[in-house]
Amino acid sequence: MKKLTSSEFRQMFLDFFKDHGHMIMPSASLIPQDDPTLLWINSGVATMKKYFDGSVVPKNHRITSSQKSIRTNDIENVGKTARHQTFFEMLGNFSVGDYFRDEAIPWAWEFLTSPKWLGLPKEKLYCTVYPKDVDSQRVWEKAGMPADHIVKLEDNFWDIGEGPCGPDTEIFYDRGQENNDVAEDDPENFPGGENARYLEIWNIVFSQYNHLPNGKYVDQPHKNIDTGMGLERVLSILQDAPTNFETDLFLPIIHATEEMTDGKKYGENKEDTTAFKIIADHVRAVSFAIADGALPSNSGRGYVLRRLIRRADLHGQRLGIKGAFLYKLVPVVGKIMQSHYPEVMDQRGFIENVIQNEEKRFQATLDTGLTLLDDLIDKAKKSDDKTISGKDAFKMFDTYGFPYELTFESAQDAGLKVDKKGFDAEMQAQKERARKARGDLQSMGRQDVTLMNIKDKSVFERDTYEEPHAKLLDIVVDDKLVDKADGEHATLVFDKTPFYAERGGQVADHGNIYDQDGELVAKVTDVQHAPNNQNLHFVDLILPMEKGKEYVLKIDKERREGLRHSHSATHLLHAALRQVLGEHTHQAGSLVDPDYLRFDFTAMEPMTPREIKSVEELVNQKIWEAIDVKTTITTPEEGEKMGALALFDGKYGDKVRVVQMGDFSSEFCGGTHCSNTNQIGIFKIISESAVGAGMRRIEAVTSKKAYEYLANRSSLLDDIQADVKATKPDNIIDKIDSLESDLHDSQKQVEALTKQINQAKAGQIFDDVKQAGDLTVIATVADVNGMNDLRELADNWKSGNKSDVLVLAAENDGKANMIISLGQKALDKGLKAGDLIKKVAPIFGGGGGGRPNMAQAGGKRPEGLNDAIKAVIEEISKN
């Protein structure tokens, strides 16, 4: 067995499958693109969906990759087991309708056992197969796996609902009984059982069926292979490490953490060792997630990052580390992974800054959470069972970021218990809600056989406004290939076309199709890419169309011009944002429309007005510099050497198109562009807003639309000038300032008069003193304007010692308000204003709270105020 570093092992896997004709696919971003079913990329196959469902046909049907992945469904187990991680790498080899089990199994055996490759002892390897999958058992035995090392398990069938599915085979490594956590005669002590002896290292899925909505299974027209090998698991074998955490991927991080403590060492005791593991795992996850564009927040991916950072910091405190420390480990992570993943070191400063800022913010959250936890402990001490409820513990976890363990330990120190079952039930309910929210989107989708079978070559004539005479090659109506279309709608493929198909954020061209006599036969309403890369024209038919005939294709030239302006301006905007905000700014999405453009990007804070102005000025400067727009067809590798930005998941073919605008902007792009930036004319940002946690959006217009926008603003300015009676536009601000000053003076006069009126009313109100038991009460619905006036009356009441209890209510704009104040005599009797207001507020459709001596509430049913006042007096009378 070879002793390999993580870098050597990763490269060996990729080289092995490259030697077997596979294309090495770079790791995709951890943030999924165009896949709402995933929060994170969580496996290698997650990036292959478009190939397996047939929506895209890859250049090479054999693919291999080492994919960054994050899984967060069981964060609480990280650090407590040998293998649980949030961030990990999944090695995989994939076949899209090419080879199948007769190749996949022998290759796996060769890579694992051949002295040229890993050289694992054959006697240590076992596999599991689906009982009905006799073919896999046959191929395994032929490859060299002993029959008594092949275990049949019903679980070996991969099926996630509607879509591709099939049997799978899992490979296990026998680590020996000395490494087991169950007895040798335990019924779970077998490959595939719940034990620590047999380590699962590789899974091969034979995706040969389609699971239909009606529950039936049918053969797929194209059978696929999907495999996954956990890099860290196999590395623990190659490096003779007891767990994943003793490999060269984790130990440098753990040693760096040790140096930050007051002498604590990894492995000395269980509690500290768990803390070291959690910190090492979590800093890897957050470093790569931030490098790929995620930022801490209160929802979605951002919430996961926030939770990981806080959990790591809490365990740092347990190790005696004071203050922010996690950010200091980022360069350690970057150095370990740099050979294959340079992004962490490339963005080191930004990642450190994000983590450090989040760590600093956590102290305030920690203080608040600890205060609330103290309240829960006091509450539990007064309860009969001396237990913090599972609901309260989950609230501490879900709302304030307190892991269950911290709540449990604090309760234990106070001699209390925590309802773990209740907590688990709340956690499971949340997971179930999330699962149901995604619903049927979990399916990978059925293969579209009709479109996949269209193999005719179609050429996109990108930069022409000519009207080509194109031959109609294929017609699809109601998901079937036909020779003639004579209904309302059809989908068409031509041998050549000037129509751009929607991709990369740019919407499709529209236009018309004419016959050879110049008669309109169809309107093109949309254009999309077929699996084999033809442009699919979705049309509304005017006249019948026949396969094999020639037609004249005319795009909407005005629409195309608008798209060219918007797309080139989008590239300039992206470059300007990176220059003004920093190169850590990631594009997170875009829309290129003929009327406007939309650009989403990662950012921790809103842009300032100065930043927006700087970006806008920089884009216009580049427009007016009249820079030639140059396009180059090259390889992805050469494109990167040219400095071109590769966006999103980095899935490119053998050739890419690089669009350059001088030395200011260079990107991989397949869209349509101006030939010179001056054709854009003018660029105007019309909005900058939030679209989610850590995500901002700019909307902008160009050319004619920018002129129309500015003309409308100018007209609006003229209207304002007339309304405020300014002599010229330059005087508008001064005129508005003067009007605001006059308004402020008038408001002060109104407030003074209102105060006088309220004082007069107070005299009348405070004269009406009632008796409730042995307490004096002033209680009425006052004729005042809402809560502010009620507070002012309450302040007057305090200074006058007019009664023991004050209950005032008011109606304003259909809303109900109430305030209760208690004097010392009422307080001495044990009355609390907060308790009283909570009890009666529902009577007028509201809720509220406050201190023992004063509380307030608002509601939606003012007609209930008198009944609420009566209820307060009744409660007081009981005392």
Curated annotation (Swiss-Prot):
Binding residues for Zn(2+): 567, 571, 669, 673
Location of this chain's protein in the cell: Cytoplasm
Coiled coil regions, renumbered to chain: none
Cofactor dependency: Zn(2+)
Domain of life (superkingdom): Bacteria
Entries under InterPro entries matching the protein: aa-tRNA-synth_II/BPL/LPL, Ala-tRNA-lgiase_IIc, Ala-tRNA-ligase_IIc_anticod-bd, Ala-tRNA-synth_IIc_core, Ala-tRNA-synth_IIc_N, Ala-tRNA_ligase, Ala_tRNA_ligase_euk/bac, DHHA1_dom
GO biological process, one term: alanyl-tRNA aminoacylation
Catalytic reactions on record: tRNA(Ala) + L-alanine + ATP = L-alanyl-tRNA(Ala) + AMP + diphosphate
Primary enzyme class: ligase
CC per GO annotation: cytosol
Major localisation: cytoplasm
NCBIfam families cross-referenced by the UniProt entry: alaS (TIGR00344)
Described purpose of this protein according to its UniProt entry: Catalyzes the attachment of alanine to tRNA(Ala) in a two-step reaction: alanine is first activated by ATP to form Ala-AMP and then transferred to the acceptor end of tRNA(Ala). Also edits incorrectly charged Ser-tRNA(Ala) and Gly-tRNA(Ala) via its editing domain.
Protein name in UniProt: Alanine--tRNA ligase
Gene encoding the protein: alaS
